[in-house]
Amino acid sequence: MHIGLALSGGGMRAAIYHLGVLRYLAQQGLMGRVSHISTVSGASICMGLIYACNANQWPSDTQFLERVLPAVKKCITQKDIQWHALLRLFLQPYYWDKKVNLLAKVMEQRWAVKGCLQDIASCPAWTINTTAYESGK
């Protein structure tokens, strides 16, 4: 049996909800059956953090429960990115129209989310959905 996950946006609340879903899958021994993940917004941030906490590999059930989930919780609860992004935005107005770049830079510095998508394991397949602000498409 293969499992496909469609994880929605909604910022950090969505990310935390998705962590609960993944915890349930890990507790049931199902992480290895996840074959495709589709994410948008907060879910994409959540997945990036999960991969960053596991050397760009999809975690096994044990890895997720014992190492990845605690590391992700620590990042979310102890390494605030919103405050640092806002502070940097006001100290460096250059980023005013480049907020996505600013968020990426802060996530790299505070949460160690870095690297290239090509470095991520190919299984499960990960589809990152987005909308262009300029066109709405």
Protein language model regions, located:
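Patatin-like phospholipase
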Residues: 2-6, 11-102
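Active-site-adjacent alpha/beta core region of enzyme catalytic domains
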Residues: 83-137
